[in-house]
């Protein structure tokens, strides 16, 4: 194994191994620096180069091992995946083409025109023929005078109001006007 260790090339100064992380002016690169410090560095450097040579050899052996023992290309059996349809054909939409295509929204006139062009029957359901169940949310109550959201109801006339000014206005109304407001809301008049 000693015969296979690669020879590490040195730079112009013999016996000094340069570490690429250190600057050239550092004392470890200087052969004439203090006493045994430089010699011990040289020994450590040569030991590390020896270890590098072994690791390089091991790496080269590891690279060659799979090629020697390989029995050729290994083909896996083409097993169909249960979630993929083998008869699926792409429609051409999607992928890189989909990002480039400009998608525009249809306006209301275009939607209505396309719905009119469809062959509707008289008994087909539409938004007006569907009987929806009553909502679970409580119905919003609006003022009979101003149309704003009304949190209050006058107990005498049963008209709804939202502010104090509306309440004072409702109290001064004659009974026929109160009946007219209630008729607009389709509420029965309780006031005789």
Swiss-Prot record:
This is INO80 complex subunit C. Keywords: DNA damage, DNA recombination, DNA repair, Nucleus, Transcription, Transcription regulation. It comes from the Eukaryota. Transmembrane segments: none annotated. It comes from Homo sapiens (Human). The keyword Hydrolase does not apply. InterPro entries: INO80C/Ies6, Vps72/YL1_C. One of its GO terms (biological process) is positive regulation of DNA repair. Residues 1-44 are annotated as: Disordered. Component of the chromatin remodeling INO80 complex; specifically part of a complex module associated with the helicase ATP-binding and the helicase C-terminal domain of INO80. Component of some MLL1/MLL complex, at least composed of the core components KMT2A/MLL1, ASH2L, HCFC1/HCF1, WDR5 and RBBP5, as well as the facultative components BACC1, CHD8, E2F6, HSP70, INO80C, KANSL1, LAS1L, MAX, MCRS1, MGA, MYST1/MOF, PELP1, PHF20, PRP31, RING2, RUVB1/TIP49A, RUVB2/TIP49B, SENP3, TAF1, TAF4, TAF6, TAF7, TAF9 and TEX10. GO terms for cellular component: cytosol; fibrillar center; Ino80 complex; MLL1 complex; nucleoplasm. It is found in: Nucleus. Pfam families: YL1_C (PF08265). The keyword Translocase does not apply. Proposed core component of the chromatin remodeling INO80 complex which is involved in transcriptional regulation, DNA replication and probably DNA repair.
């Amino acid at each position: 194994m000693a015969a296979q260790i690669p020879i590490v090339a040195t730079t112009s100064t013999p016996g000094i191994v340069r570490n690429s992380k250190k600057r050239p002016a550092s004392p470890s690169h200087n052969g004439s620096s203090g006493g045994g410090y430089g010699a011990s560095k040289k020994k450590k450097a040569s030991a590390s180069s020896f270890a590098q040579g072994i690791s390089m050899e091991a790496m080269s052996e590891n690279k060659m091992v799979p090629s020697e023992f390989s029995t050729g290309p290994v083909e896996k059996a083409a097993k169909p995946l249960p979630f993929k349809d083998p008869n699926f054909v792409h429609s051409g939409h999607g992928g890189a083409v989909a990002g480039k295509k400009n998608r525009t929204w249809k306006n209301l006139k275009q939607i209505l025109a396309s719905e009119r062009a469809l062959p509707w029957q008289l008994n087909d359901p539409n938004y007006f023929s569907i009987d929806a169940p009553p909502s679970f949310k409580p119905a919003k109550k609006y003022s009979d005078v101003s149309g704003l959201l009304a949190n209050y109801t006058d107990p005498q006339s049963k008209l709804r109001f939202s502010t104090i000014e509306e309440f004072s206005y409702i109290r001064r109304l004659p009974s026929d006007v109160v009946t007219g407001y209630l008729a607009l809301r389709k509420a029965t008049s309780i006031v005789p």
